[in-house]
Regions:
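Residue-level detector of conserved, function-critical positions
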Residues: 1-185
Length: 185
């Protein structure tokens, strides 16, 4: 099971995947996600509107074998093929239509430590690229970000960006007089 905010997701041994609204008890998602093998572990991350991020990992090596997104209508996408492109995949926020958006971090060619971040739709298509980083850091906290907004860094700027790629608030990473003395991000 997974409890995220006011969403409870349950994955049964028979492959059933159910998502409930913890406040009202309403059933948001009721699908069959298939069973997993004895040599796999499952991780669930319940997102907004009944969407579930499911990772299947090898029980011994913990390598990701599959990443699937389920919604109220069943399997939305199998993002397993993106494991070869991205070092990490995760939930970001929803778009203005309530559909989930994800982020993928990848190594930048020619650099041993730099990473880039792409914003992906639920089918794995890139909807925004060229970000240095992006995350929904304030999610589920007292300082939650507005709907359809995430923290991003692009070039020498960081701040709040909407899902259309517009800055709602940004500042230079060199915003301090003592920029050389501070990390800035």
């Amino acid at each position: 099971f997974s409890l995220a905010g006011n969403r409870l997701s349950l994955y049964g041994q028979d492959g059933s995947l159910k998502v409930y609204d913890a406040d009202t008890g309403a059933l948001l998602t009721d699908v069959n996600a298939g069973t997993i093998g004895d040599d796999q572990r499952v991780t669930l991350d319940c997102e907004e509107d009944g969407f579930v991020w499911m990772e299947l990992r090898d029980a011994d090596s913990y390598e990701i074998a599959a990443i699937r997104v389920y919604g109220p209508e069943g399997l939305v996408s199998d993002l397993s093929s993106l494991n070869e492109t991205y070092n990490y995949l995760g939930y970001l926020t929803t778009d203005a239509n309530g559909r989930p958006l994800y982020y993928g971090t990848r190594s930048v060619p020619g650099s041993s430590y730099a990473t880039g971040c792409d914003v992906l739709d639920e089918t794995g298509n890139v909807v925004m690229q060229g970000l240095g980083s992006c995350y929904s850091y304030y999610d589920n906290s007292l300082n939650a970000l507005p709907d359809h907004v995430f923290v991003a860094r692009r070039g020498f700027y960081y701040g709040w960006m909407d899902t259309d790629g517009n800055w709602l608030y940004c500042q230079s990473i060199f915003s301090s007089v003592n920029a050389d003395d501070e990390l800035g991000y």
